[in-house]
Amino acid sequence: MSLVLVAVLALLGLCLIAGAILGFAAVRFKVEGDPIAEQINALLPQTQCGQCGYPGCKPYAEAIAGGDKINKCPPGGEATIQALADLLDVEPEPLDAVEGEKPQMVAFIREAECIGCTKCIQACPVDAIVGAARQMHTVIVSECTGCDLCVEPCPVDCIDMIEVGSTVQSWKWDKPLAPGQLIASDREQAA
């Protein structure tokens, strides 16, 4: 019985020593991150499309945390701008004119011309293109962000970016103003 007790105590001692070493290492080698950049990154759409002028969502989040504008993300749109404005306690701005509001585009692969090289699949940051090697590829329209990153690597130039037309699901209209918010000229036009 005493041999078992010695073994248990030896293991307990080793565990305590290893725990102390790990605890010291965790405190000593702690990596400091910017918590606000992580919160901003969580709000971005994670398409990694580069339409904002940065190579991905995390660098853009770090730039926003450093003071860059919050209105450069077309895939996120107005909802992301509003969420970022609420988080950072700043006024929301309309999408930037350079990177900003463009017609919604989606990739279209002319399947008869596709040679199945898979270069577009590798370039797509959101995995919106499906297909196999030496087989035709197609785009999952609901997943495509219109980032245009799949067009350039295509060796046979069979990918086009086409504008998504307005549908019942995507159609938007201006919200009417409350009567107290109308100015005199608006009231005259409404009458």
UniProtKB/Swiss-Prot annotation:
- According to UniProt, the name of this protein is Ion-translocating oxidoreductase complex subunit B
- Which residues make up the binding site for [4Fe-4S] cluster 3? C124, C144, C147, C150
From the broadest rank down, the organism's phylogenetic lineage runs: Bacteria, Pseudomonadati, Pseudomonadota, Gammaproteobacteria, Pseudomonadales
From what organism does this protein derive?
Answer: Ectopseudomonas mendocina (strain ymp) (Pseudomonas mendocina)
Lineage top rank: taxon: Bacteria
Give the enzyme's EC designation: 7.-.-.-
Describe its partners and assembly state: The complex is composed of six subunits: RnfA, RnfB, RnfC, RnfD, RnfE and RnfG.
Q: Which UniProt keywords apply?
A: 4Fe-4S, Cell inner membrane, Cell membrane, Electron transport, Iron, Iron-sulfur, Membrane, Metal-binding, Repeat, Translocase, Transport
Q: Where does the 4Fe-4S domain start and stop, copy by copy?
A: 32-90
